[in-house]
């Protein structure tokens, strides 16, 4: 009898161990895809990218890190982060995580660096897929290697280009082209091809993702899906007839850039939008329109921005990220001379300071973000993981992350995090997210209330 009881205990212990291993490793028997996006809003091109990525990688689960209420190019998200989360989940993604605002409105380098830090910390991601204007990821990898290693020849060319008074992106583009051409053994070196690659917004972000993956010695495997239809900033629309036969594209009516869709929303051309977004995205967009919760662009906050800039001392403007070399004086003068953002941008922009950089500076002023804040975001090795929403599969992923990586700061309850977290750097970073939402909601026509981060819980999607 004693022998039987002893054997039974051993058997139970064995199966408990097997169960624990399964709980810890079960999802890792499957493959997980990671996507970094703005989804502003989620449209047919995004659906094409997602479904193509799943098909190529044969993954079972998908995690998306999305920007919140403001974007990397220094503007507003046209709909709030919870509505974007609903769109994302409705279209098949399992888990949605917010990219903190200190990353999401930063330079392409810091945007990518922050997103990769979060993805890598999860410990469950097998693939990262990003959209690009080329299908040749090897070229992007080669460019990222140059930017990561910064060989002397490249650094000399970069300094030379910056000394011409060019903006950093343009100077870097020219330096890269010069370095690649000088280093190439190909007598038929196609400078036009490389120029198009280096100057395209999605390629630039893709290169930064690759650089960050190398920086953090990540095991995540990158893939790129060539963009279909219109370019990133294009306001044109492409019908499915514009493409070669593709089983995914043939399910879609038309593909237009997020820029085109946002312009159509401003023009109230809702019938055209219907063809450019999945039906679920369209329904959510219409709900936001009816609720008065569309925030089309930074012009919504025009008066607030000019009030802040006029109130700020020149020294305070100089402390805004991306402000250097006396730009603060031009900003202060223009803020007192104009009351229109478009006029302001036109007068201050130069070959050194691009419109996108200036828009980000305006956003930094609006959201009270300083150079010190951006440096803090770079210093944080493991940012918090703010869960915006999940489906049943996504819920399993969250449990898997919590079980395997208890050191990660998972935010599933904002109040609990604010009340209990003792990491000062994470507190400062999260306070910026909360304030950004409070400012964003002032752009609503109706119900422009504060504290939405505390009032809106996790979006739990069920089919």
Regions found by a protein language model. Give the residues of each.
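Short terminal hydrophobic/aromatic SLiMs and anchors at protein ends
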Residues: 1-7, 12, 60
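Active-site cores that bind ATP or allylic diphosphates and position pyrophosphate for catalysis
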Residues: 26, 99-463
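N-terminal catalytic cores of NTP/NDP-binding nucleotidyl/phosphoryl-transfer enzymes
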Residues: 27-84
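Non-catalytic positions within long, well-ordered alpha-helices that form the structural scaffold/packing
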Residues: 54-55, 89, 116, 120-121
């Amino acid at each position: 009898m004693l022998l039987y009881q002893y054997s039974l205990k051993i058997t139970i212990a064995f199966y408990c161990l097997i169960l624990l291993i399964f709980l810890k490793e079960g999802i890792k028997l499957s493959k997980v895809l990671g996507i970094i996006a703005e989804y502003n809003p989620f449209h047919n091109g995004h659906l094409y990218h997602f479904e193509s990525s799943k098909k190529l990688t044969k993954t079972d689960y998908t995690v998306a890190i999305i920007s919140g209420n403001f974007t990397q190019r220094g503007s507003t998200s046209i709909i709030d982060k919870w509505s974007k989360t609903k769109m994302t989940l409705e279209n098949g993604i399992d888990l949605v995580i917010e990219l903190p605002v200190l990353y999401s409105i930063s330079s392409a380098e810091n945007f990518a660096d922050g997103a990769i830090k979060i993805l890598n910390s999860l410990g469950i991601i097998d693939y990262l897929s990003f959209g690009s204007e080329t299908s040749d990821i090897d070229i992007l990898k080669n460019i990222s290697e140059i930017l990561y290693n910064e060989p002397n020849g490249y650094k000399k060319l970069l300094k030379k280009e910056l000394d011409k008074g060019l903006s950093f992106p343009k100077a870097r583009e020219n330096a890269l082209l010069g370095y690649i051409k000088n280093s190439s053994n190909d007598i038929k070196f196609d400078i036009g091809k490389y120029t198009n690659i280096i100057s395209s917004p999605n390629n630039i972000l893709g290169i930064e993702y690759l650089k960050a993956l190398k920086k953090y010695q990540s095991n995540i495997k990158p893939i790129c899906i060539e963009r279909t239809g219109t370019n990133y900033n294009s306001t044109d629309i492409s019908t499915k007839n514009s493409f070669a036969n593709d089983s995914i594209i043939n399910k879609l009516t038309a593909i237009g850039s997020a820029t085109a869709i946002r312009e159509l929303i401003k023009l109230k051309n809702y019938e055209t939008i219907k063809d450019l977004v999945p039906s679920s995205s369209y329904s959510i967009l219409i709900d936001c329109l009816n609720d008065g919760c569309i925030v089309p662009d930074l012009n919504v906050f025009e008066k607030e921005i000019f009030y802040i800039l006029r109130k700020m001392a020149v020294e305070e403007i100089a402390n805004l990220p991306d402000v250097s070399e006396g730009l603060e004086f031009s900003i202060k003068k223009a803020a007192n001379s104009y009351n229109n953002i478009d006029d302001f941008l036109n007068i201050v922009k130069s070959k050194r300071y691009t419109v996108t950089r200036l828009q980000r500076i305006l956003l930094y002023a609006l959201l009270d973000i300083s150079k010190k804040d951006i440096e803090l975001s770079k210093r944080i090795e493991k940012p918090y993981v703010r869960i915006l929403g999940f489906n049943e599969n996504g819920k399993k992923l969250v449990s898997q992350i919590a079980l395997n990586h208890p050191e990660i700061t998972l935010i599933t309850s904002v109040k609990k995090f604010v009340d209990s977290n003792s990491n000062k750097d994470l507190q400062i970073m999260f306070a910026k997210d909360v304030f950004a939402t409070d400012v964003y909601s002032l752009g609503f026509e109706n119900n422009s209330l504060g504290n939405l981060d505390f009032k809106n819980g996790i979006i739990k999607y069920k089919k």
